Amino acid sequence: MAVLFQEEVHSHLRKRQKQKQTLVRYWKNSRMITSERILKAFMEIPREYFVETSFADQAYADHPLPIGEEQTISQPTTVMLMLQLLEVKPEHRVLEIGAGCGYNAALLGLLAKEVVTIERHEKLAVLARANLRKAGISNVTVLAGDGKLGDLEHSPYNRIIVTAAAQNIPVPLKDQLAVDGILLS
């Protein structure tokens, strides 16, 4: 019985690895994602850690998935395109608005020196912290609060990314951006 279970687990792991590789091949062949650092981060972070268990088999499907509180984890292509546009460097400090389940913050954690992410739903902030711990990411701080206010205490930030839909950029976020920084919404 234990051998069958182990074989099933290994089969699922191989399937997910193949799904990841298929997405990376698609992004490379289409020249959609050209940053090797971002592609490497995608391969390193297990997206299945950040989705509900019932959706683990869809972790690498290129569409959003529900994460609770009527929120979703963005589809992988959207996440990767935003990260590429953000042009994060290893020495950067990044502020993310909209932590969700923590997946984007985990990728940012591999790309940047330090990440602060703000989530308005306390339950999702707790989930993001747990998911980041599970993924072994230690340079990301998850705050629960109003992302429109940013995080003045730890500013300025080299990069600010708003992962939720926003009609306009709140002034506090602009004020917390470092000189020559990039703010993406």
PLM region spans:
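Class I SAM-dependent transferase core
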Residues: 2-95, 103-106, 111, 124-127, ...
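Conserved nucleotide-cofactor-binding alpha/beta core module
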Residues: 87-185
